[in-house]
Amino acid sequence: GFYVWDIESLDDPRIKAKAKKLEGNPLPVKEIKSRLAKARAAGWEMIYERHTADVRKYMDRCHIDLGGVSPNLTTKDLLRGMDISSPALRYLEELYFQYGRYLMVGSSRPGTLPAGLQGKWNNIRCAPWTGAYWANVNVQMNYWPVFNCNLAELVSPYYDLWNANFKEKQRIAKEYLKEITGKDVDDVWMSGTENSAY
């Protein structure tokens, strides 16, 4: 399991229940190794074709044309010699728009966790902002373009995360408001700034 402590010795029943729920989940190493072996067996070209076909279903839903002209330069060289009025700049803006969409397509699919502040690609053990889902507009900003870009289903992981935690957030809000006002309030909820999927 994920835990090294003895679940039965936990004092808080809420933590105990959550730990028990997750205790049976195996570490993903075995599954990851299996998927990597299948990918190696399929080969680069097959993986690339499959990926391209999958992503194209989403990317073909929205187009942008700012009159950009694709120069025969790397992005780094393009940025280095940028002329504010050049068609190459408009190309770079188009590329940036498409790259943002590509990252969303790759990091938020129905049935998965939502895109975090580092998407799905964080390679740092102690990620900036703890790799959490921050409820102070940071994570929400990831999802601002999905509706305008005809990618509405990609927001479902974000909704799923918040809906799964709604009852607990409502309970915390009731306790907090009772503590500071002395009143029972039923139609409230709150979220801490930092939130974890676990």
List PLM regions with ranges.
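Well-ordered alpha-helical segments within folded domains of soluble proteins
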Residues: 136-147
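Acidic/polar, glycine-enriched structural segments that form the non-catalytic walls/loops
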Residues: 1-133, 151-174
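Bulky hydrophobic/aromatic packing residues
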Residues: 130, 145-149, 175-181
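Active-site-adjacent "gating/activation" loops or surface patches in catalytic cores
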Residues: 171-198
